[in-house]
């Protein structure tokens, strides 16, 4: 069994803190040399949310404890993509590596200064819906596993392994 996993992703960053990372195609094994072109198109800033979207390349040892938020998000994606079974990788200390995030209909936002962010979002787009304030996002905003039905997406977090 391989203990290496990897992925190219897009990290949402605010004031140097990683709010989330989306890995559309995580894999077991070494990092692929080619970055998917659809990811490079997502790099940039979102002034209304006060964030930047950055391309990240992550390769981890799944038997070691996660080292940062990017590593943690890759592990959550591996579970939800069903590439690794529950207890098949180390999640030791993961809670402390993730930031609290305001999850909105426009994407993740920093908790600090959110009322100013809300005002910018309202000015740009109108109504803003806050879905939750939590460390773990809804799974379906990142992964749609095949062969399952999810009646209430708000109750299933990234990192869930649905059979």
Predicted regions and their residues:
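Structural signal for interior beta-strand "rungs" in well-ordered beta-sheet cores
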Residues: 143-163
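Terminal amphipathic alpha-helical/low-complexity segments used for targeting or macromolecular assembly
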Residues: 1-140
């Amino acid at each position: 069994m391989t203990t290496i996993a990897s992925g190219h992703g897009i990290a949402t960053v605010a004031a140097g803190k990683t709010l989330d990372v989306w890995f559309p195609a995580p894999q077991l094994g070494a990092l692929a040399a080619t970055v998917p072109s659809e990811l490079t198109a997502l790099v940039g800033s979102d002034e209304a949310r006060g964030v930047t979207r950055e391309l990240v390349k992550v390769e981890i040892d799944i038997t070691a404890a996660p080292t940062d938020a990017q590593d943690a998000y890759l592990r959550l994606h591996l579970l939800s993509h069903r590439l690794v079974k529950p207890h098949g990788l180390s999640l030791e200390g993961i809670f402390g590596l993730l930031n609290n995030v305001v999850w909105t209909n426009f994407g993740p936002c920093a908790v600090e200064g959110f009322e100013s962010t809300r005002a910018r979002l309202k000015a740009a787009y109108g109504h803003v819906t806050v879905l939750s304030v939590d460390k773990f996002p809804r799974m379906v905003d990142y992964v749609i596993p095949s062969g399952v039905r999810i009646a209430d997406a708000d109750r299933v977090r990234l990192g869930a392994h649905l059979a």
